[in-house]
Regions:
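A cross-family phosphate/adenosyl-ligand binding-site feature
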Residues: 1-127, 135-195
């Protein structure tokens, strides 16, 4: 399976890192593109340094992909993900900022993440948007509805608590397992009614 992962400036970097691990474990081919704000959030939430240089941040992030991922610059309009003729099975934006969601809902594009999501929608391919922000304004809700009606799946980065998590990593894994389910990828996470 070939998956595009866009990382934007919303909080939720641990979800992106764990998703990379899950995709790599499933032998997926992964293209990663992080926005400028996404790099800052990755640096802050994963590595404790919002000023970590872009290249170092991405190199450290890719350690989670175990060699299965390739990085693309947000300004790379010639990347395969910018074309509907490229064979890509699924597109995920995790985390997805409300600014990115609004851009997608309007059909505008200013970087590779926006373009890749637009390609997914126009080609009828799987697109999963993972917002985290709360509370939500009426504009946020309308943008989510617009994106969903255009074909995107909205998967909020909100863990359940019924599985008895003992730590934050288990809460992250809960959400990532739901995300992998959306992509049709098998995982080891327990399901409802399992122990």
């Amino acid at each position: 399976m070939h998956v595009f992962l866009g990382i934007t400036g919303a909080s939720g970097a641990p979800y992106a890192a764990r998703l990379l691990e899950g995709l790599a474990a499933a032998d997926c081919e992964i293209g990663v593109c992080a926005s400028t704000a996404g790099i800052e959030v990755l640096g802050t939430e994963l590595f404790g340094d919002p000023n970590l240089p872009r290249d170092e941040t991405l190199a450290r992030l890719l350690e989670h992909a175990n060699g299965a991922a390739q990085v693309y610059d947000p300004s790379d309009w010639g990347a395969r993900y910018a074309s509907g003729s490229a064979k890509v099975d699924a597109y995920v934006i995790c985390p997805c900022s409300m600014g990115t969601l609004g851009t997608l809902a309007s059909g505008a594009m200013s970087n590779l993440i926006h373009r890749a999501a637009s390609v997914a929608l126009k080609e009828g391919r799987k697109l999963v948007l993972c917002p985290r922000e709360t509370p939500l304004s009426r504009i946020h809700l309308r943008n989510m509805l617009e994106a969903q009606e255009a074909g995107a799946t909205i998967l909020f980065l909100a863990p359940g608590f019924y599985h008895g998590a003992d730590n934050v990593d288990q809460l992250v894994d809960f959400v990532v397992s739901r995300l992998l389910d959306q992509l049709g990828i098998e995982h080891e996470a327990a399901r409802w009614g399992q122990t």
